[in-house]
Amino acid sequence: MKRSLWIAKVIAMIIIPSIWLMCINAWAQEIRYITPEALKELVEKDDDTILIVDTQPKAAYKMGHIKRAINFPWTPEIKNPADLPRDRILVLYCDCTNEEDSIDMAKQLLRNLEYVYVRVLKGGWSQWQKLGYPTEKNSD
C-alpha cells in the first residue's frame, strides 16, 4: 500500500508540472492581433520596429499591398524564413475571409520556428482597403 502511494506521488510530481508547462506554452503561442487603426499609425510614423508581411501570392501582392509591406507568400510549411527578421514585430495579413493564411503562417512562425514577435492584421487586406488606408503597387 505504501509503495503504491509512493508511486502515485512520483507520477503526480511528473505529470502535474508537465501539464502546467504545456498550458503555459499554449498560452504563450496564442495568436495576437493588431487593428488596422493601430497599424496605420505605425505606418504613418515610419516605425521600423515592425515589418509588414503580405502572405498573398506574388501576383496579388503586385496588384496592391499595404505601404512598406514585403511579400512572403503563404505555404503549408515555411522552409526558409531568412527574409523575416526575429528582432522586429512581424505583422502578417492576407485577403482570406478569416485571416486563415496569416493565422497559419503565424502559428508556424511561433510554434515551429520559435519567433516571438508576430501579429495578424484583424480584418486583413480587405478591411485595410475598405478603410482607405495607404497602399502601393509593384510593377516588377
What is each stretch, according to the model?
Residues 52-54:
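Structural scaffold elements adjacent to functional motifs in cytosolic proteins
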